[in-house]
Design a protein with these regions (language model features):
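Gly/Pro-rich hinge or "lid" segments in bacterial periplasmic/extracellular proteins
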Residues: 153-209, 213, 333-338, 342, ...
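Surface-exposed binding/hinge segments that line
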Residues: 120-166
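Detector for C-terminal structural segments
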Residues: 24-25, 191-194, 200, 293-327, ...
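Alpha-helical secondary-structure segments
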Residues: 99-106, 136-140, 183-184, 211-213, ...
Length: 526
C-alpha cells in the first residue's frame, strides 16, 4: 500500500468513534477478510471463516476431537463409513434449519469442486454423502482414512453454509449469495481497505459473544498495528508473531496493567522451501550448503528476540509420528564452503561463486508487508553471501507470493507447516498437489514419485506402528534431500488492552476465540 493510501486509512481510523465498552471489540488484520466462502481459499481469511462457519467436530488443544455440530458419531469396522448424529435446534443465522439435508447440500457443493480441494486427501477418499434421517448424516469413503475426523475439523472446506445462500444450482465454486453460517458471528459490513464488521449472532446455539460487534480494521503494516494498540485504536493483536515486530511485542507486553500479552507454545515450523526443479537449487550440494550456512541461533536471538525456538527439522519431534531420529544439518560455514567447492562452484575475485560461467545466484521471495520475513530474509542473504551465494530479495503482495508457491516461480520462498490439526497428515497430503510450495520444491527430486506414493500409504495406514514407520522414512528422505531450510518453530502472540478479558489461545493457529473474550468489567462467569 502506498504512503498516501496508508495515511488515508489512518485518518479514517483516527476519526472513528469507538462505542462504549461491551459493545465493540476491535482487532486488525493486514487485508479485508474476503467474501467468506466457506468452501474456498484466498482471499478468504481463515480466522474469519472460522468465526462464521462451524464444523461437525472440533479439534481440541490436547489433540482429541470433540462433538460440535455433530453430537455423536460411529465408525464402521472397516473404517469406511462415518455416521453422525446432528445437534438438534441449530439454525443458520438466516433462520434456515441446520439438518442432514443442509449437511449433504454442503458436501455436494464441496465435492462438485473436488479438484480444487485435491491437496486434502479426504476429498479424494469420499465416495458419497447420504441423508440417514432428519438429523442423521452418513459419510462413506472409498477406503479407510485415518485423519478423517481431524480433517473434518479444519477451518475449510468442510464447514457449513446456509443452503439458501449457495450459488446457482446449490454450488459454491463460483461464489455465494451471502456468508451465512451457524457460528457466533455474522459478517455485516465490508469497507474495502478500511475494515470488516461482524455482529454477534443472536440465534447462536452455543455461548453468546459478550461483544455486540467485532470490527476488524485493515492495517497492513506491523509497526502501524503496534501503534494502534498502544494508542487504543484497536483492543487486540493476535496471531502469528509477525503481526507486530517482536521488539514491539516485548515492549507492549511489559506495559501492565494497561496492556497484557502472552506467547503460545510452538504451533508450526517456519521454513524456506528450496526449489529442486530450478537452477541453482536443483543441485543438492547447493541446497545442503544453504542448510549448513545459516546461523539460526543468531537469527532467532537477534531477529525473533528469542520468542521462537530454533527448528532443525520440518516438524518438531513432538508432532505425532514425526520423531524420525534425524541428525540436524547444523550450522557449519566451513562445511558449507567445502560442499560448494567439491561441487565445482568456484569463487571469483569478488568472493561470489560460479560454475561454467553461471553465477551461483538465487532469488528469495517473501511477503513485502511482513517485517519479520523481510528481516529474516536479510539475515539469510548475508549468511549466504559469506559462502559465495548471491541472494536477490523479492518482496511482493501475499497473493503474488502464494501464486509463486503454486507455480514454482521461486528459488527460495517462505512457508510454514500448518500446525494442528493439519500436521502432519494434511500437510503431507498437500505435498502431492501443486497447491503450495512443497510440491514445487520437491518436483525436481528423482524420488518424487516414491515420496507421493509413501504419503498415500501413510494416509491409508490403519496400524499406528506402520504409519509411524512410513512417516519416518518419508521425513528422512525429505531431510536428506535438503529441500527445506527449517528456521524456527512459529508461535502465536497476543497483546490486549486492559479493557478486554478472557483472551486466550485457541487450539489451532488459524482460529481466534473472539466469542470467549469479554469486557474486563464483566463478571468472569458471564
Amino acid at each position: 500500500m502506498s504512503k498516501l493510501a496508508s495515511l488515508a486509512v489512518a485518518v479514517v481510523m483516527a476519526c472513528a468513534v469507538a462505542p462504549a465498552a461491551g459493545q465493540q471489540l476491535t482487532y486488525s488484520w493486514p487485508t479485508n477478510v474476503g467474501p467468506l466462502n466457506p468452501h474456498l481459499y484466498a482471499p478468504n481469511q481463515m480466522f474469519a471463516q472460522a468465526s462464521v462457519y462451524e464444523p461437525l467436530v472440533r479439534y481440541r488443544a490436547d489433540g482429541t476431537i470433540e462433538p460440535w455440530l455433530a453430537t455423536a458419531w460411529t465408525v464402521s469396522p472397516d473404517g469406511r463409513t462415518y455416521d453422525f448424529i446432528l445437534r438438534p435446534g441449530v439454525t443458520f443465522s438466516d433462520g434456515t434449519p441446520f439438518d442432514a439435508a443442509a449437511v449433504k447440500a454442503n458436501f455436494d457443493a464441496i465435492l462438485a469442486n473436488r479438484a480444487r480441494h485435491e491437496w486434502l486427501d479426504l476429498t479424494r477418499q469420499i465416495d458419497r454423502a447420504e441423508i440417514a434421517g432428519p438429523l442423521a448424516f452418513r459419510l462413506v469413503l472409498k477406503a479407510p482414512h485415518d485423519p478423517t475426523l481431524r480433517e473434518l475439523a479444519l477451518p475449510r472446506p468442510f464447514r457449513f453454509l446456509s443452503p439458501a445462500a449457495m450459488g446457482e444450482g446449490g454450488t459454491t465454486a463460483s461464489g455465494i449469495k451471502a456468508p451465512v453460517g451457524t457460528g457466533p458471528w455474522r459478517l455485516v459490513e465490508t469497507r474495502l481497505g478500511i475494515s470488516d464488521t461482524f455482529a454477534a449472532n443472536p440465534t447462536y446455539w452455543g455461548g453468546k459473544p459478550a461483544f455486540a460487534r467485532l470490527v476488524v480494521k485493515v492495517i497492513p503494516d506491523p509497526n502501524t498495528r503496534a501503534i494502534a494498540l498502544q494508542t487504543g485504536e484497536i483492543d487486540l493483536v493476535y496471531g502469528a508473531a509477525g503481526q507486530i515486530p517482536s521488539e514491539a511485542f516485548l515492549r507492549l507486553r511489559d506495559q501492565a496493567p494497561a496492556v497484557s500479552g502472552a506467547v503460545s507454545a510452538p504451533l508450526a515450523t517456519r521454513v524456506l522451501a528450496l526449489n529442486s526443479a530450478r537452477a541453482p537449487t536443483d543441485d543438492r550440494a547447493v541446497r545442503l550448503a544453504i542448510n549448513r550456512a545459516v546461523d539460526k541461533d543468531t537469527l532467532v536471538r537477534t531477529v525473533l528476540d528469542g520468542l521462537e525456538p530454533r527448528a532443525d527439522f520440518l516438524f518438531a519431534p513432538s508432532v505425532p509420528d514425526a520423531d524420525a531420529g534425524l541428525t540436524p544439518h547444523g550450522f557449519d560455514r566451513a562445511a558449507a564452503n567445502r560442499l560448494l567447492d567439491e561441487a565445482g562452484w568456484a569463487r571469483g575475485t569478488d568472493g561470489m561463486r560460479a560454475k561454467g560461467g553461471r553465477p551461483l545466484a538465487v532469488e528469495l521471495d517473501f511477503v513485502g508487508t511482513n517485517a519479520q520475513q523481510k528481516a529474516i530474509a536479510e539475515v539469510i542473504q548475508a549468511d549466504l553471501a559469506r559462502i559465495g551465494i548471491a541472494v536477490r530479495l523479492v518482496g511482493e503482495e501475499e497473493s503474488a507470493i502464494l501464486a509463486r508457491q503454486k507455480d514454482g516461480r521461486f528459488g527460495l520462498i517462505f512457508g510454514e507447516t500448518w500446525g494442528p490439526p493439519y500436521d502432519p497428515a494434511s500437510f503431507l497430503s498437500a505435498m502431492r498437489a501443486p497447491s503450495h510450495a512443497d510440491y514445487q520444491a520437491q518436483r525436481g527430486l528423482p524420488e518424487k514419485p516414491e515420496i507421493d506414493a509413501t504419503i498415500t500409504a501413510i494416509l491409508a495406514a490403519a496400524d499406528p506402528a506402520e504409519r509411524k514407520r512410513l512417516t519416518a522414512g518419508l521425513l528422512t528422505a525429505l531431510h536428506e534431500s535438503a529441500v527445506y531450510l527449517p528456521i524456527s518453530h512459529a508461535v502465536a502472540i497476543e497483546v490486549h488492552r486492559s479493557a478486554i478479558a478472557g483472551v486466550g489461545f485457541g487450539a489451532t493457529l488459524n482460529e481466534i476465540p473472539f466469542a470467549a473474550m469479554r469486557p474486563a468489567s464483566d463478571r468472569a462467569d458471564r
